[in-house]
C-alpha cells in the first residue's frame, strides 16, 4: 500500500458506497435519490472507513474473527463520528437509526455495524488485493495522473457542496431558528397532552 493505492481504495469504496446507498434509497422512495453528501457519486464515509481498514487491519487478513471484530469497531466509530460531524455542520441528520434496536444516539446500530464488519472483512481479505492488481495494469505515469485528477475532482465536489450549504444557511437564518421553535412547541404540546391525560385519570 502507498499513497496512490490508498487514494484508489478511498475513491472506489466511496463510489461503491454511494451506489449501494442510492440504490436502496431509490427503491424505498420509488424515485431517484442521490445519497451522496455532495453532488458527485461519492459517499466519503465509506472511502474513509476503507482506508482505515486497509491500513489498520492488513496484518489480520488471515484471522477472520479478528478481521471482523476490527472492521466492526472501526466502521462503527467512523460512522458515529461522521454522523455527529455532519449534523453539527449541516444542522440535520443524514441518517437516523433511532427506530432500530441497539442503537447509539441514532447514529449507529448493531444491525448495520454487523453488516459493516462483514463487508470490511471481505474488502480487506479480497477486495483490496483485487484493486491493487487492477492498478498494476496501468502504466505508472498514467495511473498517477488519473489518481491526482480523480482526487482533485472529488475534493472540489466536496468543497463546493460545503460552500453551497454555508451560503444557503447564511441567507436563510430563520430556517434553523424556525426548526428550534417548532421543536420547543412540540415539547410544550406533549407536556400539555400528558397533563390533560393525567387529570382525566385522576378524575376517573
What are these regions (language model features)?
Residues 1-204:
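Aromatic-rich, lipid-facing transmembrane alpha helices and their immediate juxtamembrane interface loops
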Amino acid at each position: 500500500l502507498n499513497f496512490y493505492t490508498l487514494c484508489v481504495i478511498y475513491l472506489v469504496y466511496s463510489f461503491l458506497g454511494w451506489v449501494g446507498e442510492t440504490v436502496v434509497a431509490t427503491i424505498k422512495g420509488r424515485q431517484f435519490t442521490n445519497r451522496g453528501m455532495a453532488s458527485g457519486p461519492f459517499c466519503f464515509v465509506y472511502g474513509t472507513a476503507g482506508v482505515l481498514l486497509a491500513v489498520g487491519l492488513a496484518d489480520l487478513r488471515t484471522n477472520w474473527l479478528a478481521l471482523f471484530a476490527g472492521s466492526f469497531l472501526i466502521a462503527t466509530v467512523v460512522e458515529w463520528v461522521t454522523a455527529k460531524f455532519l449534523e453539527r455542520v449541516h444542522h440535520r441528520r443524514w441518517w437516523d437509526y433511532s427506530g432500530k434496536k441497539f442503537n447509539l444516539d441514532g447514529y449507529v446500530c448493531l444491525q448495520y455495524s454487523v453488516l459493516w464488519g462483514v463487508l470490511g472483512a471481505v474488502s480487506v481479505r479480497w477486495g483490496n488485493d483485487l484493486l491493487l492488481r487492477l492498478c498494476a495494469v496501468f502504466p505508472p505515469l498514467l495511473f498517477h495522473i488519473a489518481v491526482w485528477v480523480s482526487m482533485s475532482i472529488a475534493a472540489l465536489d466536496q468543497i463546493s457542496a460545503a460552500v453551497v450549504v454555508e451560503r444557503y444557511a447564511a441567507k436563510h437564518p430563520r430556517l434553523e431558528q424556525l426548526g428550534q421553535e417548532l421543536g420547543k412547541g412540540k415539547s410544550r404540546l406533549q407536556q400539555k397532552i400528558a397533563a390533560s391525560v393525567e387529570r382525566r385519570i385522576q378524575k376517573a
